[in-house]
């Protein structure tokens, strides 16, 4: 029972099941690498081509910092920008690592960070036989592993968040492209620094513009996060569900942590089982008649799936194999006891009531109040958690999985 809960998740549950995780100010380092292609297309798995520039933004310093290889430079520092130029890549990377050690960021962010920047800088440092442990907080060697759809990266003591990955998770509709240029134009109405030829040619012929290009990418990454509040959103999920940052992209892990904390000191939950994937019939969709119609109405049921689960007291522990007196009977196929309130019903009701309280408070204080944005983030997070509970009920790897519940819904 609960034998599969890893140490970190167990500690989060034990220490914070009945209290909030503090909303700390996260020190974020947004960064972007520029890599030379004169020697060929860079191999991410080996880091075989030199890094020629690193632009970053520190959220505490509120400043853009550039580390680059340059023989001569005429760019001067300002209040919002600092430039550091070096003769060799080793010297540049050494100073960047020292900057990371000195500023000690909680989080690295980038656009396509998992797919390029994070694995590349880790592997480039290894290629050069430099001390990659200086990227971490605890003198541990960073890890990067090739997966089917990218890389799994870990820098110990620091969170890695890929803005492209966050954006894909948050965007309600699929985009034509998820490139930084397309998303920036779509969300901000502005895009990357334009240039002709190759980036290596720009580096050689117009170094100032090359640096502007590198900085501009980081500016767009910062602006996207400021507008869409992506880090705030996923941090809100993390704190509410009491899970790790790397878990927030998987609804099953988020809800698992949420339910473990909710049941702490009340119930001991079963360990996860390796169930075979099963299919079940979903909702019946009626095909509309063809043609053009007047007076068309559109109905939306508020929190339909969570409401169904609460109305019929659905959960792993209330599902009956055989009917009992007074039980809930669905199509003479699925039976749920009414002798006790289900875990999922109680949890859903608490989330819905708490969300309603947030929305009432928002109306009372108005958008000009400093508390408004925090409440708005809170109520959206609770909405997502409610919908995610339904989503994981039919997932075979869920701790409280039972296909009959998914079918009954």
Would you name each region that the model predicts?
Residues 73-174:
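Conserved DEDDh/DEDDy metal-dependent 3′-5′ exonuclease domain
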Residues 200-312, 371-409:
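Common nucleic-acid-contacting/processivity interface regions adjacent to the catalytic cores
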Residues 102-117, 158, 163-251:
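Acidic, Mg2+-coordinating catalytic module of metal-dependent nucleases/exonucleases
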Residues 9, 15-107:
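Conserved RNase H-like, two-metal-ion catalytic cores of nucleic-acid enzymes
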Residues 1, 5, 301-304, 314-315, ...:
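Conserved catalytic core of nucleic-acid polymerases
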